[in-house]
Amino acid sequence: MISQPETPNLPCIPGTTKEVLAIMQLLKNNEVQFLCLEGEIATVAQGITYMESHSCIHFACHAHQNTQEPLKSEFMLHDGGLELADIIKRKLEGADLAYLSACQTSTGDEKLSEEAVHLAAGMLAAGYCGVVATMWSISDRHGPQVAEDFYAGLLSQNLEEPEQMHVLSTDNAALALHYSVQKLRKQLGDSALDWIPYVHFGL
């Protein structure tokens, strides 16, 4: 997990800390190994190294979508932006799931809707089998809730399949996101702009 609640020169997003702490507790309870980079240690170099050695990645940070030069779209870390171009260049063997808990990570260009190259599509191109992303800005209140419920859904499979203990099974990632979004929808009622943006790409 990579969390950046206080990115230099950008607004604070304290909800990322709450989000990551909740997910870490879920993983600990299921004895799933993980690594968390937060704050000053969440640098571009550390981030890409982390991605090369782990099958799943969770970004909880600001992101910048560059519609003119999509490969320059980036995740904003402590010392700068981790660009999509740099991620795609890497050999991410075993890449499985990427959860992009940042704003507008699947926003393309409305003039080229069938040729969209956004952060989510780029992560698929980099080798990830599945990507959870957002179509527009998300609430710092609701984002952590959706993420926590998503991982709780994934980990609930371990209870049904004991042999999956100590492993984060991503086979039903799309279904887990569906349930977590439906839970938020029931809570918010007609506030569609808050629950619609969460999407799953890939397998």
Please state what every model-predicted region is:
Residues 1-203:
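Catalytic cores of enzymes
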